[in-house]
């Protein structure tokens, strides 16, 4: 039996190991957005498939029996491609979904529709912690008054805020370390994507 795991997450690496231990032949596919990704066990391919038709062709050419979508919750394109390709080929698809984080008492969450709106809302604060990845930072570049602490696995793309501190680091991060980072930088706002997961 052969499985294709659409991955790049901790859950996808854990699943690759479990399937390999159960006797499956596993290929994990990574988008290629991180320069030095954590690689799962088994075969690994990096890069796109060429949309749903390319993925469907790859699935048939490699005689895949099961596709598992274990991508990041905001990786919408590949999830759509996987759904269309498996529907076209009749190959079963399992999608792993992390439970979203939920606010606790005294949390002050502000929901926004996009990064442009997030940038407008962030300007009312003074020390903003950005954990949104390296590709969506441009909307924050126009704010020259506030300090932005930006954490990313790889160096960011595009313009950055005039006042910023860049932290190149890869998680997972402990709650204790996150609290210390926020205290050390006097963070009064966090901009993040609700990608869920355990705390």
Identify what each model region corresponds to:
Residues 3-32:
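N-terminal basic/disordered segments at the start of proteins
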Residues 27-50, 105-108, 159-165:
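N-terminal beta-loop-helix "entrance" segment that forms/cooperates
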Residues 28-36, 96-102, 115, 134-136, ...:
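Short, polar loop motifs at secondary-structure junctions
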Residues 42-59, 167-177:
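Glycine-rich, highly charged phosphate/nucleotide-binding loops
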Residues 55-115:
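Glycine/small-residue-rich loop that forms an oxyanion/phosphate-binding "nest" at active or ligand-binding sites
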Residues 115-149:
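Internal active-site segments that recognize and position negatively charged phosphoryl groups
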Residues 158-199:
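A C-terminal functional module that forms or caps the active site or interfaces directly
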């Amino acid at each position: 039996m052969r499985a294709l795991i659409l991955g790049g997450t901790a859950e996808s690496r854990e699943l690759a190991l479990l399937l390999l231990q159960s006797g499956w032949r596993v290929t994990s596919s990574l988008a290629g957005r991180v320069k030095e990704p954590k690689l799962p066990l088994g075969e690994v391919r990096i890069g796109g498939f060429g949309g749903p038709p390319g993925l469907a062709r790859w699935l048939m050419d490699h005689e895949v029996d099961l596709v598992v979508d274990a991508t990041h919750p905001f990786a919408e394109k590949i999830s759509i491609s996987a759904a269309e390709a498996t529907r076209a080929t009749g190959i079963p698809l399992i999608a792993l979904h992390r439970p979203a984080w939920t606010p606790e008492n005294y949390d002050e969450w502000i929901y926004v529709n996009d990064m442009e709106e997030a940038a407008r809302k962030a300007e009312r604060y003074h020390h903003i912690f950005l954990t949104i990845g390296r590709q969506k930072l441009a909307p924050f570049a126009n704010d020259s008054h506030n300090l932005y602490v930006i954490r990313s696995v790889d160096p960011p793309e595009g313009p950055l805020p005039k006042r910023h501190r860049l932290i190149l680091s890869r998680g997972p991060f402990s709650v204790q370390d996150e609290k210390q980072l926020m205290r050390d930088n006097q963070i009064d706002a966090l901009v993040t994507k609700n990608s869920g997961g355990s705390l």
